[in-house]
A protein has these predicted regions:
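Alpha/beta enzyme core
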Residues: 6-17, 28-50, 54, 62-77, ...
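Glycine-rich phosphate/pyrophosphate-binding loop regions near the starts of catalytic domains
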Residues: 84
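Extended, intrinsically disordered, low-complexity segments
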Residues: 244-282
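Thr-Gly-centered strand-to-loop micro-motif
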Residues: 208-210
Length: 282
């Protein structure tokens, strides 16, 4: 498939042009995939199903193909994205596996020169297969379940000059570090540099990581600064855990799975409302 036909590029372009953000939901199981698609259909919103490399290692691609089939059958635009692919081997494997519309080429744990060189090489590999790409200039602090632990690495904020260097690799989207954090924000709370974000947006489409605790006001400020994709993790998955904790062993397994999926769907619908993506595909 030529890159010009890539669905993920189309939905993010539409979001940027119409000043909203696409909810990108981190899914670890079929329930998360179903919840994301059902919420998108109920709200007539685009959506992205995010899978970590863990999903490939754990289920040998089965979860990827399930996500791709769910996205294909959806009545609104839904795409499948590999988030935080951190080795050349997993990126090439995912690109050849089929099912992914986009892949995050995350070489942020390498020093800058090697990061840029690897990113350029892997972007070319993905583009040749019709797959859109994302990169992380700078380094977002913290860690995330399903991602190789980089919490001990020092965070580095993204500069406009650095963004341009990544744009020159051919990358389609950037996930800048502007005070956002993977995981918990800690005692200092949320401290974002919106001016930095806005200056980076002049060069490329922006995506946002580390957004779980953000308010609607913060989301809107980020969208105003050019963000068109927002990754969500715990907001989706905590309701699943809560249902499991409260009802496991007390109701039939089928009921448990259905109630967990319904709780996750409500969470995704709330995200859609906060990001302004509902009603975009009647």
């Amino acid at each position: 498939m030529p890159l010009t036909d890539n669905r993920a590029l189309r939905i993010l372009d539409h979001a940027a042009e119409n000043r909203y953000a696409v909810p990108a939901m981190c899914c670890y199981n079929v329930e998360g995939i179903l919840a994301t698609v059902r919420a998108a259909e109920a709200k007539r919103s685009p959506a992205m199903i995010l899978l970590f490399p863990w999903a490939v290692h754990y289920a040998d691609g089965i979860l990827v193909h399930a996500a791709a089939e769910a996205a294909r059958k959806a009545s609104v635009p839904v795409t499948v994205h590999m988030d935080h692919a951190q080795t050349p081997e997993i990126i090439r494997y995912a690109a050849d596996l089929g099912g992914f519309d986009s892949i995050m080429v995350d070489m942020s744990h390498y020093e800058k020169a090697e990061n840029l060189a690897l990113t350029r090489e892997l972007v070319e590999y993905c583009h040749a297969r019709g797959i859109a790409t994302e990169a992380e200039p700078g380094r977002i602090e913290g860690g995330e379940d399903g991602v190789a632990d980089t919490a001990d690495l020092e965070g580095m904020l993204t500069t406009p000059e650095e963004s341009q260097e990544f744009v020159d690799t051919g990358i389609d989207w950037l996930a800048p570090a502007f005070g956002n954090v993977h995981g918990e924000y800690g005692p200092r709370g949320i401290q974002l540099e919106y001016d930095r974000l806005q200056s980076i947006n002049k060069a490329v489409r922006l995506v946002l990581h580390g957004a779980d605790p953000f308010t609607q006001e913060i989301f809107q400020k980020c969208i105003d600064c050019g963000v068109s994709k927002i990754n969500i993790n715990k907001v989706l998955n905590n309701p699943y855990i809560k249902v499991q904790q409260e009802k496991a062993g007390k109701v039939p397994l089928t009921t448990l799975l259905e109630e967990a999926t319904n709780a996750m769907q409500k969470a995704v619908e709330g995200c859609i409302d906060r990001l302004g993506s509902g009603g975009r595909y009647p």
